[in-house]
């Protein structure tokens, strides 16, 4: 053999290997599923390449997976005639470059996840070390020579050019040197059971090298023939007599042969009524590398001008990289007339349905279709439209069971909201699937449909409030009047709600109205209208004083009928960002700051004329417009309103200082420290006693 090159495992991979080797896992059997799955992927790749270039299969025309148990040497060998690996592939993929999932998988394990999740994180190969203490990989790619990779997982591995003369033609051979306590994986029955359990629906023949013992009946003279020939004796006996006396004897003859294990035809070609739950679960697990069963399944065929069959699965959990934009979606496998074409076709299903797993087998697409021509293909557009329709049907079926739908919604509500934002064609349909907490729903979630059925007489709009969390919005000043009138308000506390609601303007003819934006119209009696006009007139002077103090911090100051208990609140323009949206946009590292200029709309301060603080402030302002304490109190009220209305403070230190000085006044503490006069925050008057009584008013 040529000289071996030694490489160190990348740190994270080394950590993962030591975790796999040194931790006890009860379900080590999943290693076989992972290795067969890798072989299947390698076969998919070469088959796809061969569609446009037949010569790619010259090295080995047959596509297969072979499993060879060797009880003499305690090894288990898995051979596939897939695409193989070049030397660079061997070095990179099996050791020196950590996949994005390596770290996540270790974190998941530490959090108590099952080792059988390994395939979902793209590191399934290393599961071989669950049962083996040494692994040797021999591989041949069409573009390179044959190489051997070897490691006992002790921090390093070697790669050598294979000069043994035993050529693969093309593909990969993995030899697992099994640990002493893992020899059960050499038993024919155990291996067959595992293939049937995990890999029954792999679309390539999986054959097991089995030992067959046949009992053969032979006569004594057949057995002794050779002996007689050697001795050279010839006896002449009566033929009839010889036949009678001839004794029969049984001997065991041992032979080896390939036994095809996965004999099932593709599950999607069978009728749904013929397939039981267990078969769907087994197919889902082999398709997705998930260790859990699916939450729901949709098996259907479309016939007519266009023909295709499909099976779609909804998982129980969201994958760790659900919204990883760098990762290409590969959850829908595309087949053409039972031939696998690709599993990362971005156009087959919209991004918001990226969590749905499954297969599509088309009768109409050309076999040699490429990713480029696929994008313009009209057939694919029709398939996509049908898949979206069937996915939504499936979600409505899940919604019939409240418990299942709660699980589904917890995992995939963001996807539905992304669908509202992106899919204008199905927006109203998806809106029916949305669920929210509300002022009347308690711990339960409510649908928009249910909200509409509970609307008060004369109520024409659906009211909602956006914010950081349910806790942050449930006592918001914006809800005071609505609650008093018994009007239900939906809590939209997911960041993506802001984007979704920007697109979903109405539901069943009812306009969606934000409780935090100006222009909130509620039904009023004649008496209420009259009283409002009187208060407006009474507080006109204070509104002007507040506007003068705050300057361009607010666009206008008006008397509010929105707040009942709080002294004031800050509302945004009808078409600008809400406070919550402003918070979200500020948090985005790559935000477009020019956009913030015109989207973060001017704030309107709405004051509550029936609040005692505001009434006292009005009296002081009317008595003396230049009262310095009025300015300080207005600034303090503005800053607290910023917080209670969901905005962030631009100058938290100034706010802190203002509060501390108010506390000192309230506690009658003299502030001897020289304080510089601040135009924004003038010092309070020296009369501590008088201010103390004022402070009681503020409290």
From Swiss-Prot:
**Which Pfam families does the UniProt entry name for this protein?**
HATPase_c_3, HSP90
Query: What are the subcellular locations of this protein?
Result: Cytoplasm
Q: What is the effect of changing residue 337 to C?
A: In hsp90.2-6; Decreased dimerization. Loss of ATPase activity and interaction with RAR1 and SGT1B
Query: List-wise, which residues carry Phosphoserine?
Result: 219
Q: What is the effect of changing residue 41 to N?
A: In muse12; enhances snc1-mediated autoimmune phenotypes
List GO BP terms, alphabetically: chaperone-mediated protein folding; defense response to bacterium; innate immune response
What induces or represses this gene?
In contrast to other major heat shock proteins, this one is also expressed at normal growth temperatures. Levels increase only slightly after heat shock.
Tissue expression summary: Present in all tissues. Most abundantly expressed in roots followed by floral bud clusters, flowers and young fruits.
State whether keyword Secreted applies: no
What is seen without this gene? Answer: No visible phenotype under normal growth condition. In case of infection, plants are altered in RPM1-mediated disease resistance.
Q: Which family does it belong to?
A: Belongs to the heat shock protein 90 family.
Provide the assembly information. Homodimer. Interacts with RPM1, RAR1 and SGT1B. Interacts with OEP61, OEP64 and OM64. Interacts with HSFA1D.
Domain description: The TPR repeat-binding motif mediates interaction with TPR repeat-containing proteins.
Q: What is this protein called?
A: Heat shock protein 90-2
| Gene symbol of the encoding locus | HSP90-2
């Amino acid at each position: 053999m040529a000289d071996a090159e030694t490489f160190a495992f990348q740190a994270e991979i080394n950590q993962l290997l030591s975790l796999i080797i040194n931790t006890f896992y009860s379900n080590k059997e999943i290693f076989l599923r992972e290795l067969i799955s890798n072989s299947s992927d390698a076969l998919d790749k070469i088959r796809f390449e061969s569609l446009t270039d037949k010569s790619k299969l010259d090295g080995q025309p047959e596509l297969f997976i072979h499993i060879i148990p060797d009880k003499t040497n305690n090894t288990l060998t898995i051979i596939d005639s897939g695409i193989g690996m070049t030397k660079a592939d061997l070095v990179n993929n099996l050791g020196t470059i950590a996949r994005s999932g390596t770290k996540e998988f270790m974190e998941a394990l530490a959090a108590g996840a099952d080792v059988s999740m390994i395939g979902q994180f793209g590191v399934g190969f290393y599961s071989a070390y669950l049962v083996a203490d040494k692994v040797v990989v021999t591989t041949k790619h069409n573009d390179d020579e044959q190489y051997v990779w070897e490691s006992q997982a002790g921090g390093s591995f070697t790669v050598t050019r294979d000069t043994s003369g035993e050529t693969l033609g093309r593909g990969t051979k993995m030899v697992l040197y099994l640990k002493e306590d893992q020899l059960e994986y050499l038993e024919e029955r155990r291996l067959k059971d595992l293939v049937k359990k995990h890999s029954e629906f792999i679309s390539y023949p999986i054959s097991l090298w089995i030992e067959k013992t046949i009992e053969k009946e032979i006569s004594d003279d057949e057995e002794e023939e050779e002996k007689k020939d050697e001795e050279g004796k010839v006896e002449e006996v009566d033929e009839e007599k010889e036949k009678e006396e001839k004794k029969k004897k049984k001997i065991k003859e041992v032979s080896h042969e390939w036994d095809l294990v996965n004999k099932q035809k593709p599950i999607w070609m069978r009728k749904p009524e013929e397939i039981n739950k267990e078969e769907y679960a087994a197919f889902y697990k082999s398709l997705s590398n998930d260790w859990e069963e699916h939450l729901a399944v949709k098996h259907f065929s479309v016939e007519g001008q266009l023909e295709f069959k499909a099976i779609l699965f909804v998982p129980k959990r969201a994958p760790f990289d659900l919204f990883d934009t760098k990762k290409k979606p590969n959850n829908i496998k595309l087949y053409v007339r039972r031939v696998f074409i690709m599993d990362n076709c971005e156009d087959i299903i919209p991004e918001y349905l990226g969590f749905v797993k499954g297969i599509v087998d088309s009768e109409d697409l050309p076999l040699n279709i490429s990713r480029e021509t696929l994008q313009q293909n009209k057939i694919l557009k029709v398939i996509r439209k049908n898949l979206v329709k069937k996915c939504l049907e499936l979600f409505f079926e899940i919604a019939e069971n409240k418990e299942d739908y709660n699980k589904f919604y917890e995992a995939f509500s963001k996807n539905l909201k992304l669908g509202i934002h992106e899919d204008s064609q199905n927006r109203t349909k998806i809106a029916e699937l949305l669920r929210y907490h509300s002022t009347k729903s308690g711990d339960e979630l409510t649908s928009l449909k249910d909200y509409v059925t509970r609307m008060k007489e004369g109520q024409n709009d659906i009211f909602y409030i956006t914010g950081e969390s349910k806790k942050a919005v449930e006592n918001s000043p914006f809800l005071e009047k609505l609650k008093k009138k018994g009007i239900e308000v939906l809590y939209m506390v997911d960041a993506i709600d802001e984007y979704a609601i920007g697109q979903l303007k109405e539901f069943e003819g009812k306009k969606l109205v934000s409780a935090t934006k100006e222009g909130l119209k509620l039904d009023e009696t004649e008496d209420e209208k009259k009283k409002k006009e009187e208060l407006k007139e009474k507080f006109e002077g204070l509104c002007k004083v507040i506007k003068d103090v705050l300057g361009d911090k607010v666009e206008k100051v008006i008397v509010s009928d929105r707040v009942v208990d709080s002294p004031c609140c800050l509302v945004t323009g009808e078409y600008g960002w809400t406070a919550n949206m402003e918070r979200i946009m500020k948090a985005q590292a790559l935000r477009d700051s020019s956009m913030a200029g015109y989207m973060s709309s001017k704030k309107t301060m709405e004051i509550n004329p029936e609040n005692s603080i505001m009434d006292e402030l009005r009296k002081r302002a009317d008595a003396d417009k230049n009262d310095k304490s009025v300015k300080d109190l207005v600034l303090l009220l503005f800053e607290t309103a910023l917080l209670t209305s969901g905005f962030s403070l631009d100058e938290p230190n100034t706010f802190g200082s203002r509060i501390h000085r108010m506390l000192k006044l309230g506690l009658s503490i003299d502030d001897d420290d020289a304080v510089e006069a601040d135009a924004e925050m003038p010092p309070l008057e020296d009369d501590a006693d008088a201010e103390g009584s004022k402070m009681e008013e503020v409290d």
